[in-house]
């Protein structure tokens, strides 16, 4: 099956459009993007590792089966451990996939899925009032693993689990973040 060719009508920008297309072609931009060539972006040398890190999404087609298998395995383990409430905790752009997961989920389980993307005390307390903490799994998503808001919410709910006398409160947390990030090291220590 072939996809229809997309049409672009740049109007008064036709000259600039054609110039940009020529530049992209002459610099072999598509191949360089797939090769994760950080030199394609004009940047300071110290930004190169950041650019390379941000291009790792290009590896997803090769990794997706393994990632899905791991997620299914983790979900089965969570159900076996008695978790029946799930809170996605994230800030900024990390929230987008979580919001989609909640909104696209089966309506019969939506009452047990929650999205927390705010540190507003009233919002946090309203959510907390709905949760049976002993049966709640918190999934923290942060690309960099450095967001102060995410860390504050992790510490808040960890404290709540400890205050409730829940054994092994670290088992109530899952982290999706970059390898080697602060959040990843915190998850490994738990």
What do these predicted regions represent?
Residues 1-79:
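Extended, charge-enriched "interface" segments that sit outside catalytic cores
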